């Protein structure tokens, strides 16, 4: 099974979740709020791969996205390498800098990925707009 999550920046808004079996038939479709609910459904479905539509890493050199923190990106371009590669191809993407407006989404995605990986799940970051 494959499991996809269109994650929202806050549990106050529902995240769309979809599980596909190996024949690509819908095995699960739902809208979930809390990360715990998402994790519980994933643990019932036991997918081979979990795809999350949210940035799951920070730019190299950053430990956080807080402007008050002295951490700095290693590159003068500030965004992640994958974001720069997309932009080179003319594909826009949300910034992953300290001034980003999707800070909550990034933090939530990273926390969810960490929890799922600790449980032994295979998690990947996806960006459907780019495909």
Question: Where are the language model's segments positioned?
Answer:
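Phosphate- and other anionic-substrate recognition elements at nucleic-acid/protein interfaces
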Residues: 1-131
């Amino acid at each position: 099974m494959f499991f996809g999550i269109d994650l929202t920046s806050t549990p106050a808004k529902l995240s769309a979740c979809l599980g596909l079996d190996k024949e690509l038939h819908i095995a699960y479709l739902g809208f979930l709020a809390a990360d715990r609910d998402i994790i519980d459904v994933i643990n019932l479905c036991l997918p081979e791969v979990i795809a999350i539509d949210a940035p799951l890493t920070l730019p190299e050199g950053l430990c956080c996205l807080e402007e008050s923190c002295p951490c700095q990106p290693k590159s003068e371009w500030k965004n992640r390498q994958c974001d720069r590669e997309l932009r080179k191809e003319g594909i826009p993407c949300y910034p992953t800098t300290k001034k980003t407006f999707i800070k909550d989404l990034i933090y939530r995605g990273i926390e969810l990925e960490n929890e799922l990986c600790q449980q032994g799940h295979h998690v990947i970051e996806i960006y459907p707009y780019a495909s």
